[in-house]
A protein has these predicted regions:
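Glycine-rich phosphate-binding loops that contact phosphosugars or nucleotide phosphates
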Residues: 40, 44-163, 167-172
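Bateman/CBS regulatory modules and CBS-like beta-alpha motifs in cytosolic regions of diverse proteins
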Residues: 194-224, 230, 235-237, 242-243, ...
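A short, polar/charged loop-to-alpha-helix boundary motif
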Residues: 147-148, 250-256
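Internal, active-site/partner-interface "lid" segment
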Residues: 133, 147, 174-205
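An N-terminal, well-structured beta->alpha segment
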Residues: 2-41
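Short loop/turn microsegments at loop-to-beta-strand junctions
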Residues: 9, 122, 230-233
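Short acidic active-site motifs
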Residues: 31-35, 80-84, 220-221
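Terminal peptide-recognition signature
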Residues: 17, 50, 95, 168, ...
Length: 256
């Protein structure tokens, strides 16, 4: 094995990819704006399509769109040729990913998509490709080189396609006035959803309450607190009115 400077190589990869991403920002213009307008007018879903690495990007893009207010689904280009293209309806928008723009399976799908009169937005690395020529809107995410020294491994081209996809999703989010509460609705079991959607009544305990008389000794509060494992006891008076609470934090401070 050759002795190489691993840190230098890693930094070089990041630098190349960063420059590629920055160059894509300069390409964003009318095509991007038209793509946003078409999607905002769409009454169906944004159906993302891709194969290989572009398929992974398309799947990620669909997930991001769906979670930020734009209904979307992903269709694998290979599976699309064997029935899955039936999931594309004429009120949808096709968002197609291909770095070369010449992916055979993608090109085979185009006549079927056109029969549905579906708008085709392509995110491609070659704006002169067959896919680009067959698209209604072309978003160019071509890069001068990959971060791979062989200029073969999809690296910079992947980063730029993801960057464009994220830019599209967030632009649509802002256009729709999508809020954190809307985001929480599509993430009900995540930390954001729990924080924004759950009410105190959903999580508070209402049965087998750790109740003591406020005149009880401190040792009694420890016993009750340990028994119910809530980290707190509720103190009541002779008329069963709540007069206060005593927490495990209060206990630690008392015993210092």
């Amino acid at each position: 094995m050759r002795k190489i400077n691993k840190i230098r190589i890693a930094k070089n990869v990041i630098e190349i990819e960063s420059k590629s991403l920055a160059s894509i920002a300069n390409k964003i213009g009318q095509s991007f704006q038209k793509a946003c307008d078409i999607i905002l007018k769409c009454k169906g879903r944004v159906v993302t399509i891709g194969l290989g690495k572009s398929g992974h990007i398309a799947a990620k893009s669909s997930a991001t769109l769906s979670s930020t207010g734009t209904p979307s689904t992903f269709i694998h280009a290979g599976e699309a040729l064997h029935g899955d293209i039936g999931g594309l309806k004429n009120d949808d928008v096709a968002l197609i990913y291909s770095n070369s723009g010449e992916t055979k399976e993608i090109l085979q799908l185009l006549p079927i998509i056109k029969l549905l009169k579906v708008n085709i937005i392509s995110i491609v690395g070659d704006k002169k490709s067959s896919l680009a020529k067959s698209s209604d809107i072309v978003i160019d995410c071509g890069v001068s080189s990959e971060a791979c020294p062989l200029n073969l491994t999809p690296t910079s081209s992947v980063i730029t396609a993801i960057g464009i996809s994220d830019a599209l999703a967030i632009t649509l989010l802002e256009c729709r006035g999508f809020t954190s509460k809307d985001f929480a609705k599509s993430h009900p079991d995540g930390s954001i959803g729990k924080r924004l959607l759950k009410k105190v009544s959903d999580v508070m305990f209402t049965k087998k309450l750790p109740i003591i008389n406020y005149n009880n000794k401190l040792i009694k509060s420890i016993e009750v607190m340990s028994k119910y494992n809530h980290g707190v006891v509720i103190a009541i008076d002779e008329k069963k009115n709540v007069v206060g609470i005593f927490t495990d934090g209060d206990l630690r401070r008392t015993l210092k």
